[in-house]
Design a protein with these regions (language model features):
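Outer-membrane beta-barrel translocator/receptor signature
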Residues: 137-140, 151-229, 235-239, 288, ...
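Acidic/polar loop-and-plug regions of large Gram-negative outer-membrane beta-barrel proteins
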Residues: 211-215, 227-297, 310-343, 389-429, ...
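Gram-negative outer-membrane beta-barrel transporters
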Residues: 451, 551-556, 571-653, 686, ...
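Membrane-embedded beta-barrel scaffold of Gram-negative outer-membrane proteins
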Residues: 295-309, 313-319, 493, 500-501, ...
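Acidic, small-polar-rich N-terminal luminal/periplasmic segments of exported/outer-membrane proteins
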Residues: 40-173, 536
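C-terminal beta-signal and adjacent terminal beta-strands/loops
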Residues: 644-651, 669-716
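Structural signature of Gram-negative outer-membrane beta-barrels, strongest in the C-terminal barrel
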Residues: 234, 343, 362-366, 370-374, ...
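Repeated loop/turn-to-beta-strand initiation elements of outer-membrane beta-barrel proteins
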Residues: 201-204, 238-241, 301-304, 360, ...
Length: 716
């Protein structure tokens, strides 16, 4: 690992020194960002040290970033385009303290400070917990907040959350933006952004995208369609209404990676083999989401907002994947299943934000509530191999030679012993209907005791009520969890551009899990998992436009488990994750934008009797990323980046290892005119073979080799 980091860091350092020599005086990226923000209206933007909005956002109040006692990172739409990001996973790679999990080839999955999540996603501050791949076509920016914090986000958020801020109508303007790109794998996309001023006080904005998917793996293809019309109306100076509808339609091949070998590392010889059925490894996802927000200023010191969101989601995925590999015989064990989810979500949330003073002490008080009503129907059918049944073995596993391609297609395969097998998804494993109702109320006070001292104190009450019907046997199980989650923060400000803070926050996850598919015994008798975050950090605005942040933290998970048939006998399984994060981001000079992040993570699993000696899975000890934008001339810009991770374990038993890696990326962009830009992004410049993430020890993702993306963007 040391050699990989040293080699990559040396290359990057040399290039970082060399590129500025090309630079000439040019308009700054900060100016460009501010100009773009002005054109796109009052969205959540970064201007100096303030994250502000007259809309709901992840922080729920207009709070200077420097005064937030929690680690957070923001990726703007401009950064998304310049760095060539085309997925949430790309953004995560360049964010400290977080990394990607595999998501079984059918969903986003982020590891926040060592805690894996497929549900801690939000859109404009509203929960978006269905499992799918989220697009970037309609975003102003992406916010990643780290550390458990149920006060603002409710259940989950056990290691952090990711919030997408969408584009809204811009009153008084007419414009059309577009993007088209194609990469060396053959994938391409087309984005459109159209804003129409429908009156002096209203605007209609339509964002749409079509993406044709392809990559370096056999059989992979797919498409993504997104359409998001939004309407904004300003009803006088004090009231704004935003309405939106989003239609999402995804279809893609499911690739769950390759197995590990006898040495516990991914089998490099399998880098081109897809262990699945080209006709049956498939996921589809359709969503219809309606959202409306009303914001009103009752006075200069009291504002309120109310959001209603309704979503209808339909997802299915079928897949075959490896569960084991025998190096002596070159034989893999193949398992499979098909899973469907039909979900409807209603979310109502509201906040009152007041600013007032009591006895010379200033307050920013947030009072809020949330109601969630969810119905979820989930079923799973396991694969049945007729040869396994005939042999009297487990029906959903068979053994194939590790060949390219795997001898399985259309449900018919040739086994390692030469026999023909037929497989169908016919064994019912689960069929549940869940109804979930959540009532929440929260209160937070940001107290300014003096110019140099601020305190944040608050708490949230959640009542989580779930009923699950098991259609296999008609059993109905219910559970209600009432939880209070506190948040405390202390901020010292020796000077206006410097904050030193400490904070404590909690969150919880009911035993029905992130996707609440069941509460079968013994889970119906167990309390929720609880998570706490103790953090201390510093935020320093070195000068306007350049900020340095750092934090040390400890996350503790408490997960009660039944150790035998008696639910009264529990074995409490804990994990403790300690770490350090640092980030430097902003305009170093008028021609150099820098975003750099580092994290150190150390996590151990614990039982009731103490530490087990095992490390938490998917927890690289060291992670580092850096991205530079250099404005070489008035029209030419260059980008250079590095993302690197230490080795980590793919499983909790610490038997499978993901090797360390370092990947270097490049970019060049040229402004053909004031309204048209062409650019090229090169990923994995030195064609490193790497394995960035996994789902289990036998499902390891193969990183993409050297590739390039060519993009044209414009606006008129």
């Amino acid at each position: 690992m040391i050699h990989s980091f040293a080699r990559a860091s040396l290359l990057l350092s040399c290039a970082t020194i060399a590129f500025p020599a090309l630079a000439e005086t040019a308009p700054t990226a900060a100016a460009s960002t501010e100009s773009a923000a002005a054109e796109s209206g009052p969205q959540i933007i970064v201007t100096g040290d303030v994250l502000y909005s007259n809309q709901i956002n992840a922080l729920k109040s207009p709070t200077p970033i420097i005064d937030v006692p929690q680690s957070l990172s923001i990726t703007t739409a401009d950064q998304i385009v310049r760095q060539g990001f085309d997925s949430i996973g790309d953004i995560v790679l360049y964010t400290p303290g977080v990394t990607n999990s595999q998501g079984e080839g059918n969903r986003d999955s982020v590891v926040f400070r060592g805690v894996r999540s497929t549900a801690d996603f939000f859109v404009d501050g509203v929960r978006d917990d269905v499992q799918y791949y989220r697009g970037l076509y309609n975003l102003e920016q992406v916010e990643i907040l780290r550390g458990p914090n149920a006060l603002l986000f409710g259940r989950g958020g056990t290691g952090g959350i990711l919030n997408r801020v969408t584009k809204k109508g811009v009153v008084g303007e007419n414009f059309v933006g577009y993007r088209g790109s194609v990469d060396t794998f053959g994938a391409f996309d087309i984005w459109a952004d159209v804003n129409l001023a429908t009156s002096e006080n209203s605007a209609l904005r339509i964002n749409a995208a079509y993406e044709d998917l392809n990559n370096h793996r056999d059989f992979f293809d797919g498409e993504q369609i997104g359409i998001n019309p939004t309407f904004r109306a300003e009803l006088g100076a004090a009231t704004t209404i935003d309405l939106s509808y989003e239609y999402v339609d995804h279809e893609r091949f499911v690739d769950r990676g390759i197995p590990t070998g006898a040495d516990g590392t991914p089998v490099r010889a399998f880098k081109r083999i897809t262990f699945g059925d080209p006709d049956n490894n498939l996921t589809t996802f359709t969503a219809h989401v309606l959202r409306g927000t009303v914001q009103h200023a009752f006075s200069d010191s009291l504002k309120g907002n109310l959001t209603a969101s309704w979503g209808d989601y339909d997802k299915a995925y079928s897949n075959f994947f490896t569960t084991g590999f025998d190096p002596a015989t070159n034989v893999v064990a193949i398992d499979g299943y098909v899973d469907t989810t039909r979900r409807k979500n209603l979310v109502l949330s509201g906040n009152l934000i007041g600013e007032f003073a009591t006895g010379g002490i200033n307050h920013v008080l947030i009072v809020g509530g949330e109601f969630i009503d969810t119905s979820n129907n989930n079923d799973r059918f396991n694969a049945v191999f007729d040869t396994a049944v005939a042999d009297g073995r487990r029906a959903d596993v068979e053994f194939f030679a590790a060949t390219r391609p795997l001898a399985l297609r259309g449900g018919v395969g040739t086994l390692a012993d030469g026999r023909t097998t037929n497989v169908a998804f016919s064994a019912l494993n689960d069929d549940t209907e869940a109804d979930l109702t959540i009532f929440s109320a929260y209160l937070q006070d940001e107290i300014k005791l003096a110019e140099w001292l601020r305190v944040v104190v608050g708490a949230r009450f959640d009542s989580f009520d779930i009923t699950v019907l098991d259609n296999r046997n008609g059993a109905v199980r219910t559970r209600t969890d009432d939880k209070v989650s506190p948040r405390l923060g202390l901020i010292l400000k020796p000077q206006p551009n410097l904050s030193i803070y400490t904070s404590y926050s909690e969150s919880f996850l009911p035993r029905s899990g992130e996707q609440f598919s069941d509460i079968n015994p013994p889970n119906d008798a167990l309390d929720p998992d609880t998570f706490s975050n103790l953090e201390a950090g510093v935020k320093w605005d070195i000068y306007p436009g350049l900020a340095l942040t750092g934090a040390v933290f400890e996350i503790e998970q408490n997960s009660p488990q039944v150790s035998d048939a008696n639910p009264d006998t529990l074995d409490v399984i804990n994990s403790k994750i300690r770490g350090f994060e640092a980030q430097l981001q902003g305009q170093v000079t008028d021609w150099w934008f820098l975003s750099a992040g580092y994290s150190y993570l150390d996590g151990k699993q614990q039982s009731r009797t103490g530490p087990t000696g095992l490390r938490v899975r998917e927890l690289p000890e060291h992670m580092f990323s850096i991205w530079n934008n250099f404005q070489a001339t008035d029209r030419l810009g260059l980008g250079l980046g590095l993302t690197a991770q230490d080795d980590s374990f793919a499983d909790n038993s610490n038997t499978a290892t993901l090797p360390s890696y370092a990947r270097i990326d490049l970019a060049a962009f040229y402004d053909v005119s004031d309204n048209v830009r062409v650019q090229v992004n090169v990923e994995n410049l030195f064609d490193e073979l790497y394995f960035p993430n996994a789902h289990t020890a036998n499902e390891v993702t193969v990183g993409a080799p050297l590739n390039a993306r060519f993009t044209i963007t414009g606006r008129f």
